[in-house]
């Protein structure tokens, strides 16, 4: 049985200081290898030395094997994860909240599992998030946390699920680009584990090298033999063992075909493992403050009594820091990660979410293998040689309480000539064969980008500029690379498109238009129906933001001749059609958009508004239910449900989930404005005002909205904006 509940907990806490009320831009700060800009988030620069008991609104989730505590007020982090069989915390449990100035916006705490997105360390790691609890049909329970972040206007969710009879924590990540332009992100789940001289990181056996941040340095692994972090490892040092790393050190694995990473306590014979699909989760990282005086000083900075830890980070759609991936307009990416406790196995050789195994030589003639299961499973286990000779074949039942531990005489056969297979009903569940004994080449460290004038081709100028944008480089300016390319070839399509999109992001729409017109003219010189529709779509954006809607509409529609832009292009058309009260056209266009991207959550909300305006309320309500089944934090759909039903309880649920956060109201109201739904937007901001959920921007947005919609109350809204406290907003 799985249960979840909300509970107030008291945790000794060192309070943080007040955020700086005026913006700190930090536009040239280098942070974790990329830009340290945090605007519009406020920055906190002080911590208290005094500890107080502080109450937090925790959410617990528990089954027969695992108990987890989540703190929505601190970024939705996993604060505690407890193994009920072994009676131990399999994730480092810091009994105090003791922040240090490590985070992107200031405060950061050690322990638990932190989720770093859209960059590292997460800007909102010490801020509240939205939450809800979902009970699933199979008896599992999911605790969802959600955030619409302020820097790039992306949306991220994490769902923490426990299933009956399963000894793992399942985490589903769902990332969504709410904007009309491409955005970049990374996702690093950051579990901490308690360490001592007996602790060993468990990386897959095919990893022979590790990189530093930005791939600026490289080391062999697990035995380091050169200089890494200015430490001389020439004697050959096993850096998978915590005790051997004396200085602060990061390392990130180079390429693995395995789905796991973790760590093992050789003294207590217990460990933690992360499992995820390596095709989308290649990131495997260890970080330590170091087993030395500096590291112990940081232990004291971050905890009172819980001692040293390391971080065993797991990256999805990323393999390094920084290493960003693109999210196209309105694109959603989702994935699943598993964190689980295990025991007795030692250094895992292969693992899935269901089964873990290890095999080692035992004396001269035998081997010993152990298999751990995360649920009760009846499986067939076969140990054989490469020549097909069977040494062991048995159907066995394995449970989380009792692992399989067998010693088998293999007549002295070498370990690397053996194969272990675990199957059920003819389906392979887990397979092991030793890695070939070969010396793999160590990859080269990354090189700094050349200056624009040093690059030979316009193609490389474009790719370098795009890389700088993608990785949010703090000091190199991508514009210089695009401009150098255009100095050499003024009508180059890619560089004109890149500069046009750059200026759209900067709000310089007329300047963007000039570059995009050049790109489109070149693109269509010989062919009015080009292979790539992105410059045409971007030109539509530049025109739309200049309120030249008919011209924009034509461009958006033309971009939809290319399949890649039908999602965003038809959605943009539907917004303009709604704005112009052409609802039949809008409905057709929004349906075409949704055919290309079923998880365009903004399109779903707009379609409900269109159906409501057309009087097709039953269809709208059904779409709302379908949409909320996909994303319970689709606040646009929730507000539409209230507008259709006029049921106050529906509004109350929405307000509770939005937790009094002005940014949530702004985002949804601005979605309405983008489609000319001025009355709906104004009504939503008026709800926020009535609840006292305001910043000066609430009133400025409202005044602008009322003016655009030809509605009354414009002067009063702007008067209220002027009187509102500008702290943490700085709207002027």
What are these model-predicted stretches?
Residues 495, 528-529, 535, 569, ...:
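TPR alpha-solenoid repeat register
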Residues 347-456, 629, 633-653, 726-730:
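Long, contiguous interaction/recruitment modules in multidomain scaffold/adaptor proteins
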Residues 466-467, 501, 541, 575, ...:
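Residue-level recognition of tetratricopeptide repeat
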Residues 2-3, 7-23, 59, 69, ...:
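A contiguous, surface-exposed recognition patch within enzymatic or periplasmic domains that forms
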Residues 24-54, 58-62, 109-168, 296-325, ...:
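Extended, loop-rich substrate-binding clefts of extracytoplasmic carbohydrate-active enzymes
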């Amino acid at each position: 049985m799985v249960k979840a509940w909300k509970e107030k907990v008291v945790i000794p806490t060192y309070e943080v200081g007040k955020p700086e009320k005026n913006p700190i831009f930090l536009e040239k700060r280098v942070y974790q290898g990329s830009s340290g800009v945090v605007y519009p988030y406020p920055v906190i620069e002080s911590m208290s030395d005094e500890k107080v008991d502080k109450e937090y609104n925790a959410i617990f989730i528990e089954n027969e094997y695992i108990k987890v505590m989540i703190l929505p007020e601190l970024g939705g982090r996993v604060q505690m994860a407890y193994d009920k069989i072994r009676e131990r915390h399999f994730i480092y449990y810091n009994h105090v909240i003791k922040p240090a100035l490590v985070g992107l916006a200031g405060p950061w705490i050690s322990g638990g599992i932190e989720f770093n997105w859209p960059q590292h360390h997460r800007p909102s790691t010490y801020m509240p998030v939205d939450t809800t609890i979902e009970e699933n049909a199979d008896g599992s329970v999911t605790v969802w946390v959600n955030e619409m972040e302020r820097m790039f206007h992306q949306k991220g969710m994490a769902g923490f699920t426990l299933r009956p009879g399963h000894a793992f924590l399942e985490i589903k990540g769902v990332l969504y680009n709410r904007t009309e332009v491409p955005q970049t992100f990374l996702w690093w789940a950051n579990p901490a584990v308690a360490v001592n001289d007996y602790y060993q990181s468990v990386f897959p056996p095919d990893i022979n090298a590790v990189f530093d941040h930005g791939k600026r340095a490289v080391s062999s692994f697990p035995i380091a033999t050169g200089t890494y972090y200015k430490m001389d490892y020439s004697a050959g040092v096993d850096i998978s063992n915590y005790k051997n790393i004396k200085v602060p050190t990061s390392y990130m694995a180079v390429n693995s075909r395995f789905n796991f990473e973790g760590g093992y306590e050789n003294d207590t014979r217990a460990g933690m493992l992360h499992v995820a699909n390596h095709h989308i989760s290649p990131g495997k990282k260890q970080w330590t403050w170091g087993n030395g005086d500096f590291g112990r000083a940081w232990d004291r900075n971050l905890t009172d009594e819980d001692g040293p830890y390391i971080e065993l980070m797991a990256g999805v759609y990323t393999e390094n820091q920084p290493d960003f991936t693109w999210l196209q307009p309105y694109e959603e990416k989702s994935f699943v990660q598993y964190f689980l406790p295990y025991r007795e196995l030692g250094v895992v050789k292969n693992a899935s979410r269901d089964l873990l195994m290890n095999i080692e030589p035992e004396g001269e003639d035998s081997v010993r293998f152990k298999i751990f299961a995360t649920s009760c499973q009846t499986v067939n286990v076969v140990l054989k040689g490469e020549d097909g000779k069977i040494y062991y074949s048995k159907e066995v039942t394995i449970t989380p309480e009792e692992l399989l531990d067998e010693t088998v005489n293999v007549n002295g056969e070498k370990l690397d000539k053996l194969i272990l297979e675990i199957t059920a009903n003819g389906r392979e569940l887990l397979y092991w064969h030793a890695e070939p004994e070969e010396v793999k080449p160590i990859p080269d460290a990354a090189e700094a980008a050349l200056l624009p004038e040093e690059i030979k081709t316009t193609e490389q100028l474009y790719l370098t500029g795009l890389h700088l944008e993608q990785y949010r480089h703090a000091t190199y300016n991508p514009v210089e690379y695009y401009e150098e390319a255009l100095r050499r070839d003024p009508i180059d399509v890619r560089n004109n498109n890149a500069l046009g999109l750059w200026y759209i992001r900067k709000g310089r729409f007329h300047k963007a238009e000039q570059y995009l017109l050049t790109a489109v003219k070149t693109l269509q010189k010989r062919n009015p129906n080009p292979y790539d529709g992105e410059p045409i779509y971007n030109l539509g954006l530049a025109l739309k933001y200049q309120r030249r809607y008919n011209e924009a509409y034509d461009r958006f529609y033309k971009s939809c001749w290319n399949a890649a832009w039908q999602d965003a292009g038809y959605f943009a058309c539907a917004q303009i059609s709604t704005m112009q009260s052409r609802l039949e056209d809008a409905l057709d266009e929004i349906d075409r958009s949704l055919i290309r991207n079923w998880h365009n959550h903004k399109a779903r909300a707009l379609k409900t508004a269109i159906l409501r305006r057309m009087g097709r309320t039953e269809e709208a309500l059904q779409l709302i239910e379908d949409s909320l089944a996909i994303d319970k934090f689709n606040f646009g759909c929730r507000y539409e449900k209230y507008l259709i039903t006029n049921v106050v309880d529906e509004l109350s649920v929405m307000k509770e989930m939005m937790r009094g956060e002005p940014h949530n109201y702004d985002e949804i109201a601005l979605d309405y404005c983008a489609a000319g739904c001025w009355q709906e937007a104004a009504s939503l901001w008026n709800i926020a005002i009535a609840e006292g959920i305001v910043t000066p921007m609430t009133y400025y947005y409202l005044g602008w909205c009322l003016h655009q919609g030809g509605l009354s109350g414009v002067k009063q809204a702007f008067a209220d904006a002027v009187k509102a406290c500008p702290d943490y907003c700085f709207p002027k």
